[in-house]
Amino acid sequence: MKRLFTIVCLLLATLTLPAQYRRPPYGDLYESVTVAAMREDVRFLASAALEGRKAGSEGEREAARYVSSRLEEEGVDVLTGPQGEPFGIRQENGDTLSSHNVLAFIPGYDKSVADHYIVIGARLDNIGTYELTIDGEKVTRICYDANGNASGLAMLIQLASMLQRNKVLLRRSVIIAAFGASCMLGAGSWYFLNRSFSAVDKIDAMINLDMLGTASSGFYAWPSGNADLTQFLSNLSATLQPIVPQVVTREPCFSDHKAFYDKEIPSVFFTTGMYPEYNSEKDTESILEYDNMERELEYIYNFAVQLCCGPRPLFKLDEATAARLNGKMVVPYYECDVKPTFLGSTDPGVFLQKWVYAYLHYPAEAVRQGIHGRVLVDFLIDEKGNVKDAHVLKGVHPLLDEEAVKVVGASPRWKPGKVRGKPVISEVSLYVEFILERRKNR
């Protein structure tokens, strides 16, 4: 939507900001102001009232309104109004699901690059609720999603506040984004890049924040195989920082950075990775490590300033990623002229039914622990139809993740996809679902 780009250009010249009152937090008297603010934001975003913020739900809409008001309160210009920018998603049943993106803007000072942007985003939604059958009775559980991704949203608000207060340091401009319907294969970020923002060619880089609350088990940065971003991370980590991420070469999980990567925009994904309470009613505020989140925030802020002021990173692969792909282009499944086929069908559902679910074994220990959910598996189909490099983009638990990857990776040959009549390496992502039903003892 060109309107957003026009508003951004106008805001480069002026800033007028309303403010809102926010109730101060109680308790935790010795924690920092930043930690107290993140704690309060998480308490609201992960509250039972929002019912897990499922895409299209009233809980997601309320989360969008909350993030909008908090950004305004921190003095950041919100581009999309109090409700966020609406967009629709056509569902398989023909209905349209309505979601919202929240976009805000911080202007850069250097006129030569102020019309170039660093996008910093976090997903707004999660899976909402789920049902279990216990002793023959259906029971609804809320996935409160404190770590996934109230933690990223709380950090996004604080990061926006820090950048706004120190905007005199920023050569490039910054777009703050809370993406709706992210769990629907990144619908919000796709809409932003393909329908909403007209100056995509001037987005120099993207920073994605997702699941950042459990740093004691690891703090990671995935630069999407980009050599320049890897160097940026290395340079910053060589300086005195409160915490330093481990740079990883495998994508920790699926998130909104992928839409930017597909547009060949250099992207870095910050996360503390998967955790046992993921997508369950146990993902509550109590598992978050706020002191570590504050340390992560400081590092990510310094990285964002570095991106805003440094040379534009080029979209190029590092040696490890280039070696994995052997210099060959990877084409997303849906962009192939002739899509890959399994047993004569281009529908990935046939692969799931005829192969995956036919040979999938529910791990006994997972059954004992009551672990269930959907594992998002990504894999490549090479020019000969062989399945390679199967790995988890969005996991549930190591027991289920390992079984899903094992079955997908053992797939028989496909008929490869083609572009302009020639076989290509194609990339497929699909969910493998583990359904657990507890039956009444007889």
Question: What are these regions, as identified by a protein language model?
Answer:
Residues 276-325:
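His/Asp/Glu-rich mid-to-C-terminal helical/loop segments that flank catalytic regions of hydrolases
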Residues 45, 71, 89-134:
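Acidic/His- and Gly-rich active-site-bordering loop/insert found
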Residues 1-22:
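Bacterial Sec-dependent N-terminal signal peptides
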Residues 311-442:
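Charge-biased low-complexity segments
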Residues 24-32, 48-58, 89-93, 138-149, ...:
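Second-shell loop/turn segments in exported
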Residues 53-107:
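A non-catalytic alpha/beta surface segment that caps or lines the substrate-entry region
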Residues 104, 120-126, 130-185, 300:
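Alpha-helical metal-binding/catalytic segments enriched in His/Glu/Asp
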Residues 179-272:
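Metal-dependent peptidase/peptidase-like ectodomains
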